[in-house]
Amino acid sequence: MESEKDFLSDIFYYLPPRIRAFFLKLPPNICDEITEIRLRADKPVSIVTRNGCAFITSGGRMSFICSDNLPVITGSEISDMVTKMCGYSVYSHQSDLVNGFITLKGGCRVGICGTAVIQNGAVTAIRELTSVNIRVAREIKGCSDDISDLSLIHI
């Protein structure tokens, strides 16, 4: 079975190299539990796991305590990352971006926050990106077995 860390490497590819290095140091059991990666400009890098929200240390560990020595991501790194997620063609993803998200290969959804550009009452673009929230898509085998068994009873 492919490990979660291998699956996550597709997501890690989009992270700035400096931030990616911290994630690559994480133990596999931590990677197995990541459901979201939260990146906010000039704030510590955080993840969401089954145990709640935690921060990533520069040593590749998890910390439940926010401190000044945690790695932060810059606004410029967030902009570069979104550009990479858009295949270096932000314009071709503009309709997704104005809806606040893009979808990566493999089904991971990436929420995008920034300043909305509004024309005639409609959001037409997003600029000055401030945060990215990567929701990790996972296959959970058998999760609907009980439901599908019930639906067969009523046929």
Give the location of each predicted region:
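A short beta-strand signature within small-molecule sensing/ligand-binding domains used
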Residues: G111-I112
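Conserved small/polar residues in nucleotide/adenosyl-binding loops
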Residues: I153-I155
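Beta-strand/loop-dominated core regions that host nucleotide or nucleotide-derived cofactor-binding catalytic loops
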Residues: M85, Q119-N120, T124
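N-terminal pre-Walker A segment at the start of P-loop NTPase domains
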Residues: I126-I147
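Short, acidic Gly/Pro/Ser/Thr-rich loop/turn segments
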Residues: P44-S46, Q119-N120, K141
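N-terminal accessory targeting/assembly segments
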Residues: M1-G106
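Short, charged beta->alpha transition segments
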Residues: L97-G100, G142-S151
